[in-house]
Design a protein with these regions (language model features):
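Single conserved hydrophobic/aromatic residue that forms the stacking wall/gate
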Residues: 1-12
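A Lys/Arg-rich helix-loop hairpin that forms a DNA/phosphate-binding surface
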Residues: 17-20, 33-53, 243
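N-terminal DNA-binding recognition helix of tyrosine site-specific recombinases/integrases
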Residues: 28-32, 41-43, 57-91, 144
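Flexible interdomain linker/hinge and immediately adjacent N-terminus
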Residues: 49-50, 85-120, 207-214
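Conserved tyrosine-mediated DNA breakage-rejoining catalytic core shared by Y-recombinases
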Residues: 93, 153-189
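Active-site/catalytic core of tyrosine-dependent DNA strand-transfer enzymes
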Residues: 112, 180-238
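Short, basic (Lys/Arg/His-rich) helix/loop patches that form interaction surfaces
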Residues: 121-127, 196, 225-253
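C-terminal catalytic core of tyrosine-transesterase DNA break-rejoin enzymes
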Residues: 138, 142, 146-149, 247-253
Length: 253
């Protein structure tokens, strides 16, 4: 299967996030098709439109629909290049392959102010993970809306004095941030105490470029978002609180 082969290639090149997208997309296509055996001849515009309708009926967001369609389009185009499928101009024209904001991700000002206050003792007592989650969220906010993936993979060596230099996981772009005193204080409070670990925070334990570590990151991300959901509930916030909110709140300021 071309998609399976592409997934293995991504793993070999350490693109585990991309391989995860291909795997999720392929699973959705197989579920819709009812079989792993899918000929490229069957992938006509009627098939694509039906697949789009199927995804929406499964409550997939438009951005998820777009991700799956763009993945299928990439697989189809590779098949065309290898003369395994026919070239059809604008083959994916009538299905959604764009991006849209399905919901408002930036926090309301009142919610941000509530988050900035120390958690009431009756809330955080015995719930260190909730405190740590709140701290990570603020660090992401103060570090120019840093994505959770970059926070998780930060190394101790990335911080020299009050300067943090790191490379974006998604784009490879090198970024330098001068840390404010309050940011430094928060980092020192929650940084990794394991001297043998290269990571700045105790989020990951495995080697940087292994599939096991990527899976560990996926689990950490799900737990982080779950803890943020708990924070929203205990603080009675009106805004949606997720790993994206710190980034989008930074952009909206």
């Amino acid at each position: 299967h071309l998609c399976d082969r592409r997934q293995r290639q991504m793993c070999i090149r350490d693109s585990y996030g991309t391989a995860h997208v291909y795997r999720s997309s392929m699973n959705a296509i197989i579920a819709f098709n009812g079989s792993r055996n899918l000929s490229f001849k069957k992938v006509n515009q009627e098939f694509l439109k039906s697949f789009e309708t199927y995804l929406r009926e499964k409550d997939c967001s438009w951005n998820t629909v777009s991700t799956y369609m763009r993945t299928l389009r990439a697989v189809y185009n590779r098949a065309v290049d290898r003369r395994m499928a026919s070239y059809i101009p604008h083959h994916f024209r009538y299905v959604y392959t764009g991006t849209r904001a399905d919901r408002k991700r930036a926090l309301e000002k009142e919610d941000m102010e509530r988050l900035m206050k120390e958690l009431p003792k009756q809330i955080h007592q015995g719930r260190e993970e909730l405190q740590r989650t709140r701290a990570y969220f603020f660090l992401m906010f103060m570090l120019r809306g840093m994505p959770f993936v970059d926070l998780a993979y930060l190394k101790k060596q990335d911080m020299v004095g009050n300067v943090l230099t790191y490379r974006r996981r998604k784009t490879g772009r090198l970024l330098t941030v001068t840390l404010l005193p309050e940011t430094m204080k928060l980092i020192k409070k929650y940084m990794n105490t394991d001297s043998a670990s290269p990571y700045l925070f105790p989020i990951l334990t495995g080697g940087e470029s292994t599939e096991a570590t990527y899976r560990e990151y996926q689990i950490a991300l799900r737990n982080f978002n779950y803890q943020l959901l708990l924070l929203k509930q205990v603080l009675a916030l009106t805004s949606d609180l997720s790993s994206y909110a710190a980034k989008h709140h930074t952009i909206s300021i």
